[in-house]
């Protein structure tokens, strides 16, 4: 066995860097947290080549004294704790004194720093060794430049993800810190292109608007509560505004972004059954607590913590979120129309056996075209300068708001009406067609009897069928849209006024990366700057609320697993079918009969696209048992 010996400082720093510095985002996190601990109110982060080539973090904090620069790059040297007792009441984001030493061990680092009223100093480090130091002109604060990350540990480079993924991890880190410190102005840029800029005015809602987009911030509710040990506050999305992953749940404990299963569960319990299955809210939850109740020294990244009185905090979170919905319900109830009368059972019974079908003629529409080539309906609006708007102000309209479609969009949209292809003549009660023999479907031929409320009553031999007309119409609409998407023959309709869609920086990056795939469903997006896209036309299978529909489609696409285009087509068709068929309508006998015919032609006549039952069958034997005539 070789002799035991002490490792060199350079080697120990490289080993420590393996735990602290996993990827470029780790460097950004450590440096920005140092800036926040130094009291900075303005922080700028620039990176090149996903952070591997260069990362620059500049702040206006207190700076580092010239005689302490060397000490700052020494392992376990810190100004944030002094003894073992301080470890149990950590009030800063960093405290171990490992970051700068670990970063300099695997890169080339240059630091330019100055304290108030003092001459600045510039020092350089490479591979954990100091290369030089000199006086330099500098403002109060610190600027650290990291170049050629992992230059001396090439094996680490093989385990990094794609440049796009590494960029998104950097963006996510800054987003979380910006949400945790709305009083600090953050600027993040990639090779000179600004990805995020926040005002630093302490307005959390405005910060959310810059991080996630104004359309999301406007749909979020404020909350605040406290007990003897905890104070919580933040913003939460309404139940209809969700995501299919937990990535938009930000829990900030004394400004530190943490991951905690029990607190996540408390948030979900607060929403209860208001959320759809496997959907999660967008929420920024800020928790203020005495540092004595928190142990942050349990994980290298400090994202996992140990909390005293965690159950009490969970109850506070759940009850606070629930109370937001209770208050909203009370406000809504106050304006409810109390004079609405319940329909009588007689009014609900609709046996339309001999009703005629109204012949509705199609309206003429402007000339339309297929999506073989991208249309040019209008001249492009002038693109805004990249640096024109510093940040999103919810109280000041954007200059390009004139391009945004508002609730009166229908005045500017030339719609092609899409009517149901029902026959003009009265259909016979027996649902039988000469072409139906080719249907190898196990749904039998049904004879229409009548309707009660939202249900169609039909029979086959001695069996009785109840068909939910809403679910049935959704199934038919789903099949129609899905077949259109598969055929790639999607008709476009031009917009008289283009729509500008704003997104958060992460969403913008993901959508831009998938623009070509999104074109397959007939949605053409153009980069319009400031994390926004412009839309000049839309597919005619979108019948109303064009802007909101496109937003929902893109939101769903962000969380779509990689796979075949059919997966996207099915999701889009199912979502649009649900939007098109929102409730029951009064069906003529011929229309109801046509639904029964068309159901037999579908892939699954028994369920709609969301898996809900379309029909229920009651056999003659079951009916006899119900009436005790089985003997």
From Swiss-Prot:
Example of a GO MF term: ATP-dependent DNA damage sensor activity
GO cellular component entries: mismatch repair complex
Ligase keyword on record: no
InterPro entries: DNA_mismatch_repair_CS, DNA_mismatch_repair_MutL, DNA_mismatch_S5_2-like, HATPase_C_sf, MutL/Mlh/PMS, MutL/Mlh/Pms-like, MutL_C, MutL_C_dimsub
SUPFAM superfamilies: ATPase domain of HSP90 chaperone/DNA topoisomerase II/histidine kinase (SSF55874), DNA mismatch repair protein MutL (SSF118116), Ribosomal protein S5 domain 2-like (SSF54211)
CDD domains listed in its UniProt record: HATPase_MutL-MLH-PMS-like, MutL_Trans
SMART domains in UniProt: DNA_mis_repair, MutL_C
GO biological process: mismatch repair
Keywords linked to the UniProt accession: DNA damage, DNA repair
Signal peptide start-end: none
Family: Belongs to the DNA mismatch repair MutL/HexB family.
PANTHER family associated with the record: DNA MISMATCH REPAIR PROTEIN MLH, PMS, MUTL (PTHR10073), DNA MISMATCH REPAIR PROTEIN MLH1 (PTHR10073:SF12)
Reported function: This protein is involved in the repair of mismatches in DNA. It is required for dam-dependent methyl-directed DNA mismatch repair. May act as a 'molecular matchmaker', a protein that promotes the formation of a stable complex between two or more DNA-binding proteins in an ATP-dependent manner without itself being part of a final effector complex.
Name this protein carries in UniProt: DNA mismatch repair protein MutL
Gene source species: Lactobacillus acidophilus (strain ATCC 700396 / NCK56 / N2 / NCFM)
Top-level taxonomy: Bacteria, Bacillati, Bacillota, Bacilli, Lactobacillales
């Amino acid at each position: 066995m070789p002799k035991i010996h002490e490792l060199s400082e350079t080697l120990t720093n490289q080993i420590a860097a393996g735990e602290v510095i996993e990827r470029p985002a780790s460097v950004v996190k450590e440096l920005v947290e140092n800036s926040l601990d130094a009291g900075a109110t303005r922080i700028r982060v620039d990176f090149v080549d996903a952070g591997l080539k260069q990362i620059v973090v500049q702040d206006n904090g207190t700076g580092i004294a010239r005689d302490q620069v060397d000490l700052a790059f020494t392992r376990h040297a810190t100004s944030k704790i002094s003894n073992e007792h301080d470890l149990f009441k950590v009030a800063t984001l960093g405290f171990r004194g490992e970051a700068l030493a670990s970063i300099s061990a695997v890169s080339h680092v240059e630091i330019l720093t100055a304290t108030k009223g003092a001459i600045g100093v510039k020092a350089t480090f490479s591979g954990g060794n100091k290369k030089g130091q000199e006086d330099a002109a500098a403002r109060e604060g610190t600027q650290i430049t990291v170049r050629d990350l992992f230059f001396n540990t090439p094996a680490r480079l093989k385990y990094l993800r794609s440049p796009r993924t590494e960029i998104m991890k950097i963006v996510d880190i800054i987003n979380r810190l910006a949400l945790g410190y709305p009083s600090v102005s953050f600027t993040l840029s990639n090779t000179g292109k600004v990805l995020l800029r926040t005002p630093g005015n302490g307005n959390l809602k405005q910060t959310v608007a810059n991080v996630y987009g104004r359309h999301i911030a406007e749909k979020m509710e404020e909350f605040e509560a406290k007990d003897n040990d905890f104070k919580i506050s933040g913003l939460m999305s309404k139940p209809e505004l969700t995501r299919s992953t937990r990535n938009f749940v930000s829990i900030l404990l004394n400004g530190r972004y943490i991951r905690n299963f029990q607190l996540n569960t408390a948030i979900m319990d607060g929403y209860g059954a208001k959320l759809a299955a496997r959907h999660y809210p967008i929420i920024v939850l800020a928790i203020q607590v005495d540092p004595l109740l928190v142990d942050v020294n349990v994980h290298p990244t400090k994202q996992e913590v140990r909390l005293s009185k965690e159950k009490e905090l969970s109850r506070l979170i759940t009850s606070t979120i629930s109370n937001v919905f209770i208050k909203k319900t009370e406000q809504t109830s106050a304006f409810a129309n109390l004079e609405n009368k319940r329909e009588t059972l007689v009014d609900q019974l609709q046996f339309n056996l001999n009703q005629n079908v109204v012949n509705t003629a199609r309206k003429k529409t402007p000339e339309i075209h297929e999506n073989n080539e991208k249309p040019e309906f209008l001249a492009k609006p002038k693109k805004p300068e990249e640096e024109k708007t510093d940040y999103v102000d919810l109280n000041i309209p954007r200059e390009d708001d004139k391009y945004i479609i508002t609730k009166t969009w229908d005045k500017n949209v030339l719609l092609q009406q899409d009517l149901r292809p029902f026959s003009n003549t009265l259909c016979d009660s027996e649902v039988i067609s000469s072409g139906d023999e080719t249907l190898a479907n196990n749904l039998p031929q049904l004879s229409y009897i009548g309707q009660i409320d939202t249900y169609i009553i039909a029979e086959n031999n001695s069996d009785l069928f109840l068909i939910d007309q809403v679910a049935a119409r959704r199934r038919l609409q789903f099949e129609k849209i899905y077949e259109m998407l598969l055929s790639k023959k999607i008709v476009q309709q031009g917009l008289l006024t283009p729509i500008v869609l704003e997104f958060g920086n992460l969403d913008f990056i993901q959508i831009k990366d998938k623009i070509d795939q999104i074109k397959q469903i007939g949605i053409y997006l153009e980069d319009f700057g400031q994390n926004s896209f412009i839309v000049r036309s839309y597919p005619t299978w979108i019948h109303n609320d064009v802007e909101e529909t496109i937003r929902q489609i893109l939101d769903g696409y962000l969380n779509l697993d990689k796979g075949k285009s059919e997966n996207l087509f099915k999701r889009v068709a199912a979502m649009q079918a649900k939007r098109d068929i929102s409730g029951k309508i009064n069906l003529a006998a011929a229309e109801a009969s046509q639904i029964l015919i068309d159901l037999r032609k579908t892939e699954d006549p028994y369920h709609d696209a969301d898996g809900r039952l379309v029909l229920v069958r009651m056999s003659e034997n079951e009916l006899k048992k119900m009436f005790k005539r089985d003997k």
